[in-house]
């Protein structure tokens, strides 16, 4: 009798994706982050669903409804902090996942990579709108500042901003629609994830050598299911330590003050995972220029396949580009730090230097390094 997992129309799909999937025998723990991101998405959808049962998207009651969840709902505090810190864990995994993709040249699987870039934008949009929902000071002013950036678009900017706001300022209409979008987007993200996996399984996974691994494949289960489970345990341990011992460490104290349109906080800043992009935005004095730089700081990922000059796929055996890569990582950490600092000397000039370095390394230095390495190895 044929095994049901190989014949049943539905189970067969799961079998080909997670059980009998041929996987390279040498993929390292850097390949764990895909499954960890799936776990993060599941946690966010579940905790978000329970929060939505008690939350009210009205400017008069939004803040107090979040307080009510934390004080009066059974384990409401846990659900709320799991959701808030779950977003941070999500972005940590995302950044590591993208970083792995850049290091090992996974961007050469163009459909999978572009789907991933779209996913990154979708997750960032979802997180931004979620941050607005508690209706604290930083929620309100963050929403005001970031949506107002669209007014830099020539001709249609002002109209577009008022259309998104549903009025002449961030108000009840804005909060209601942000809640609606924040609720629906994770399900759209789930659909996009399936497409991402569909494209990945067309080509098969990359591996640390960057070489073709068709000659040496092993089944996904039990090898990588067990390996992924170890990653899951480590992630959950870190997640629960963060949630139960340091729930507010990544948040902003200003968000415990109800939104007040008449009182601007001294330093408006987004959550930590947007600070690098916020620093790039602020480092350009011109409004439209800043917005373009902000979008390009993420969109530049889609250009990576075009900027790949090396005859080798991964950075494993390319010391010059490796050096550039780690300088880029350090540069992103500097940008993240600068994004949380006030706009004054010396932070302005550090931010501008780091922003120029970010684009220079990706657009100029890494492609040149690739060509130099080809020359050294006589690969051209």
Swiss-Prot record:
A GO BP entry: mitochondrial electron transport, ubiquinol to cytochrome c
Family of the protein in this entry: Belongs to the cytochrome b family.
Organism: Microtus felteni
Protein location: Mitochondrion inner membrane
Membrane-topology annotation of the record: Multi-pass membrane protein
Protein name, UniProt field: Cytochrome b
Coiled coil start-end: none
MF terms (GO), sorted A to Z: metal ion binding; ubiquinol-cytochrome-c reductase activity
């Amino acid at each position: 009798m044929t095994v049901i997992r190989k014949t049943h129309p539905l189970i067969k799909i799961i079998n080909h994706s997670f059980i009998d999937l041929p996987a390279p025998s040498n993929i390292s723990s850097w390949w764990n982050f895909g499954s960890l991101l799936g776990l993060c998405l599941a946690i966010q959808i579940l905790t978000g669903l329970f929060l939505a049962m008690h939350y009210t998207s009205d400017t008069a009651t939004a803040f107090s409804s979040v307080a009510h969840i934390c004080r009066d709902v059974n384990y409401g505090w846990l659900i709320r902090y799991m959701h808030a810190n779950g977003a941070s864990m999500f972005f940590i995994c995302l950044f590591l996942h993208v970083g792995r993709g850049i290091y090992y040249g996974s961007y050469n699987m163009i459909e999978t990579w572009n789907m991933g870039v779209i996913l990154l934008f979708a997750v960032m949009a979802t997180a931004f709108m979620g941050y607005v929902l508690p209706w604290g000071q930083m929620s309100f002013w963050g929403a005001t500042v970031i949506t107002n950036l669209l007014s830099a678009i020539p001709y249609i900017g002002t109209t577009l901003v008022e259309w998104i706001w549903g009025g002449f300022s961030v108000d009840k209409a804005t909060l209601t629609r942000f809640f609606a979008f924040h609720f629906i987007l994770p399900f759209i993200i789930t659909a996009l994830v399936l497409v991402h996996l569909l494209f990945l399984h067309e080509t098969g996974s990359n591996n640390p050598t960057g070489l073709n691994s068709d000659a040496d494949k092993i089944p996904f289960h039990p090898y990588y299911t067990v390996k992924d489970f170890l990653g899951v345990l480590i992630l959950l341990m870190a997640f629960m330590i963060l949630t139960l011992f340091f729930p507010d460490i990544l948040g902003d104290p200003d968000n415990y003050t109800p939104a007040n349109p008449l009182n601007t906080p001294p330093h408006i800043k987004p959550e930590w995972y947007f600070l690098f992009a916020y620093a790039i935005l602020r480092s350009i004095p011109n409004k439209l220029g800043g917005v373009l730089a902000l979008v390009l700081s993420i969109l530049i990922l889609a250009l990576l396949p075009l900027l790949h000059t090396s005859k080798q796929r991964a950075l494993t055996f390319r010391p010059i580009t490796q050096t550039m890569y780690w300088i880029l990582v350090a540069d992103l950490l500097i940008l993240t730090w600068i994004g949380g600092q006030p706009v004054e000397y010396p932070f302005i000039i550090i931010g501008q230097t780091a922003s120029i370095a970010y684009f220079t390394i990706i657009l100029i230095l890494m492609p040149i390094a690739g060509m130099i390495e080809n020359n050294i190895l006589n690969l051209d």
